[in-house]
From Swiss-Prot:
Keyword annotations of the record: Glycosidase, Hydrolase
Active site: 240
Enzyme Commission number(s): 3.2.-.-
One GO-annotated biological process of the protein: pyrimidine nucleobase metabolic process
Protein's name according to its UniProt entry: Pyrimidine-specific ribonucleoside hydrolase RihA
HAMAP family: Pyrim_hydro_RihA
One Pfam family this sequence matches: IU_nuc_hydro
Any single Gene Ontology cellular-component annotation: cytosol
Lineage: Bacteria, Pseudomonadati, Pseudomonadota, Gammaproteobacteria, Enterobacterales
Function in brief: Hydrolyzes cytidine or uridine to ribose and cytosine or uracil, respectively.
CDD domains given in the database record: nuc_hydro_IU_UC_XIUA
Gene3D superfamilies, per database record: Ribonucleoside hydrolase-like (3.90.245.10)
Length: 312
């Protein structure tokens, strides 16, 4: 039986590829997709969800737009990474259908209520929508199997020296998620920076030869340019968000540890930092499964295998 999934995202090149991977995987039943503000403004990330689902021929999936800003802060976007549209590079189709008239939180709550079994929430942007859901619907916590997030790191950052972008945008929301009592799975920079897609991998995807694999290759062409900056020391583009979906499909590709994680919301230098109690110094019970390593080649092979799905 397919695993029911709610997908909250802020497309974003890597979010878009995570959508492609999820919808090529019969192991997953994506019940709804909600958009968050982060990689681009909320109107653009919502439109990008609709554009991707139009490309994939999946206008049957309900879509709703989420919060327009973080819980307590002004919005920060990553247009320097993802471009003016949020998905610069390929020529994507215009949306062929409209989003739901309800909010993201309302769609999430409806989906949870109607599901006969607990649902896995995958969140690959800031945690604002998920935190709002948890705060406004405590009665639905029991309907959430786990929350799988892309965010955070153990001791490094990609937006500040201490903070990863998704957590930095809305640290208060992330803290609500981590302390909710619901199992959290964290795909942080420790693992996603190892999930690099090289130029030869992109050409492998392109050679698959279907319209979706071509778009994915063109997304990666654009995404790779930003990551060529010498400061990163990368040999490719880290494909952050698809790690969440890959973990659901093939957890054996990842090395994980069970640890307590908190989020710094006040620090002068460390705002947005995920504090991972690696050596059990706090005495706090672990609240997260933290990914620390990945079989990169296995990850690339999984992407290539699932891109072939779209040939049919």
């Amino acid at each position: 039986m397919a695993l029911p999934v709610l997908f909250d995202c802020d497309p974003g090149h890597d979010d878009a590829i995570a959508i492609v991977l999820a919808l090529a995987s019969p192991e997953l039943d994506v019940k709804a997709i909600t958009s968050s503000a982060g990689n681009q403004t909320p109107d653009k990330t919502l439109r990008n969800v609709l554009r991707m689902l139009t490309l994939l021929g999946r206008n049957d999936i309900p879509v709703a737009g989420g919060a327009i800003k973080p819980l307590m802060r002004d919005l920060i976007i990553a247009d320097n990474v993802h471009g003016e549209s949020g998905l610069d590079g390929p020529a994507l189709p215009e949306p062929s259908f409209a989003p739901q008239t309800c909010t993201a939180v309302e769609l999430m709550a409806k989906t949870l209520r109607e599901s006969p079994e607990p649902v896995t929430i995958v969140a690959t942007g800031p945690q604002t929508n998920v935190a709002l859901l948890l705060n406004s619907h405590p009665e639905l916590h029991r309907k959430i199997a786990r929350i799988v997030i892309m965010g955070g790191a153990m001791g490094l950052g990609n937006w500040t020296p201490a903070a990863e972008f998704n957590i930095y945008v809305d640290p208060e929301a992330a803290e609500i998620v981590f302390q909710s009592g619901i199992p959290v799975v964290m795909a942080g920079l420790d693992v996603t920076h190892k999930a690099q897609i090289h130029a030869e991998d992109t050409e492998r995807f392109r050679a698959t030869g279907n319209p979706v694999s071509t778009i994915v290759a063109e997304l990666l062409d654009f995404f790779l340019e930003y990551h060529k900056d010498e400061k990163w020391g990368f040999t490719g583009a880290p494909l952050h968000d698809p790690c969440t979906i890959a973990w659901l499909l093939k957890p054996e590709l990842f090395t994980t540890v069970e640890r307590w994680v908190g989020v710094e919301t006040q620090g002068k230098y460390t705002q947005g930092m995920t504090v991972v109690d690696y050596y059990f110094l706090t005495g706090n019970k672990p609240n997260a499964t933290v990914m620390v390593d990945i079989d990169r080649q296995g990850f690339v092979d999984l992407l290539a295998e699932r891109l072939a799905f779209y040939a049919s």
